[in-house]
Amino acid sequence: LNKEELVHILSARTLDGTIPGLYQALQNGHAQAIKSYGNLVLDTIDKNIDLEYLISAFKYETHSSNKYTPGLFSAFQNGHADAIKAYCGVLGNSNLTRGEIIRMLEARNYDGAPGLLLAYQNGDINTIQSFFDSLIMLDISKDFIEELLTAKHYDFTG
């Protein structure tokens, strides 16, 4: 297999190419699958651009590559605290830059809404606490923790 074929296989996207397997695991709260997938990808892929593509787990809206939702966003939406913790563990074990990790932790959808905002709206204390604990585990600076926990909605739609 060449690198492109391997990345395609590891993305485990649906037949129409819009939904990656990791997105589905995050959406459905399959923490062990997230850990196992993360280990497989981290052991197999060495280029950050491919790693970021695979771990970001963007679901693209049908017929629009401009509209996407990260898997972590769906985990927040559905209150999957263990899945969020597992995902953060994968990020912590990766060689992604601090900036790349923070961008993924924001979990913003195509219109700028951060995933954590949904946990706040749902009053999901367990998910919020799990995310906070994960930020500490990832050794994220206090300033970035404050920014992430503020969960500001930036309107990207213009």
Question: What is the meaning of each model-derived region?
Answer:
Residues G17-T18, K67-Y68, G112, D155-F156:
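Start-of-repeat signature of ankyrin repeats
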